[in-house]
Design a protein with these regions (language model features):
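Active-site-proximal alpha-helix that buttresses catalytic centers in soluble enzyme cores
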Residues: 2-339
């Protein structure tokens, strides 16, 4: 099958530069996605064009400038590096695409099938460990849309999630373990937040997510297959079990929320301050929701989070990097592409 199947890796995307005009263009495409801000089109348009894009691009551009590399966007650079390493290990044609920005999914699929017309199938791997409406779901829908329009005779398969896959857990655990060798007071798992309504909208049962006590613990296969909250809790559970971390030494929080609607709690910035106020002097923070370092890890956690912790009385703040181009992650991702 390998000579008939190609692989498309898909990550989030990034502005082309730190120029506010490029950031504005990127934010428009990202935030106008109906799966990111899931309100009626006219409301979304008014919110984004009337409010957000008049204030956010300048602020976001300043944040991007703090973390921008000479080669470009860290997320793009790191995604390209890991892609090149994986490609050398996989005997299949491969392309890398982004959900938003110039490295579009349409461009990635077109390159894949133009260079390799013999392909009958594409395996698409979203670089998101956990399934969510605003990440994996929108990627799958966009790929299906392009395939139906431009490559209707080709077959599509995809990896929906890998939050509990053994090799991913092993790679995350090994990475974290390397940063826990020195004494620490608390470990905070910070995952990207999502609106609570995204969970209930995707729940195929209509009666489980956030509607029964301890919903993420009560077995419900259909709901949990698309439940971001359940999946991040499972990732955390598997990592702490593997490393033998006591229950009172770690907690879970959610970052990067937007105002105006309930998001998953507790919020990371609140948790960072709370832990410092409770006398935790040495904090380690990890974000397994991201496989490549990006604005949310390098700036939001690495800079803003550190400042918040130190200002609240903390003394040592350790941000664990993402898997990035670590060899065990490269081999894990290559395995997903091969099998």
């Amino acid at each position: 099958m390998s000579n008939k199947q190609g692989v498309l890796l898909v990550n989030l995307g990034s502005p082309e530069s730190t120029d506010p005009k490029d950031v504005k263009m990127y934010l428009r495409e990202f935030l106008m996605d109906k799966h990111v801000i899931d309100v009626p089109y006219w409301k979304r348009w008014l919110l984004i064009e009337g409010i957000i894009l008049n204030t956010r691009p300048k602020k976001s551009a300043a944040a991007y400038k703090k973390i921008w590399w000479e080669e470009g966007s860290p997320l793009i650079v790191l995604s390209q590096r890991v892609f090149e390493k994986v490609r050398k290990k996989v005997d299949k044609p491969m392309e890398l695409a982004m959900r938003y920005g110039k490295m579009s999914i349409e461009k990635g699929l077109t390159n894949l099938f133009t260079k390799n017309p013999e392909l009958e199938e594409v395996k698409m791997i979203p670089l998101y460990p956990h399934f969510a409406k605003a990440s994996t779901h929108t990627v799958i829908e966009k790929v299906e849309e392009v395939m139906k329009e431009k490559f209707p005779t080709k077959k599509l398969t995809y990896l929906q999630s890998f939050y509990n896959e053994e090799n991913y857990i092993n790679a995350q655990s090994k990475l974290l373990g390397e940063h826990l060798k020195e004494d620490y007071d608390h470990l905070l798992f910070s995952y990207h937040g999502i609106p609570e309504r995204h969970l209930t909208k995707l729940d195929p049962t209509g009666e489980h997510c956030l509607k029964c006590e301890n919903c993420c613990e009560v077995p419900k296969k259909a709901a949990h297959a698309v439940c971001y909250r359940h999946q991040v809790f499972q990732t955390t559970k598997l990592i702490v079990e593997k490393l033998g971390i006591p229950e009172d030494k770690y907690s879970v929080s959610f970052q990067s929320r937007l105002a105006g609607t309930p998001w998953l709690k507790p919020y990371t910035d609140f948790e960072i301050e709370r832990l410092a106020h409770e006398g935790k002097k040495k904090l380690v923070i990890l974000s397994p929701a991201f496989v490549s370092d990006c604005l949310e890890t390098l700036e939001e956690l690495g800079m803003e989070g550190k400042d918040e912790f130190l200002e609240a009385g903390g003394e040592k703040y350790t941000l664990v990097p993402c898997l990035n181009e670590r060899e065990d992650w490269v081999e894990t991702l290559a395995g997903y592409c091969r099998n």
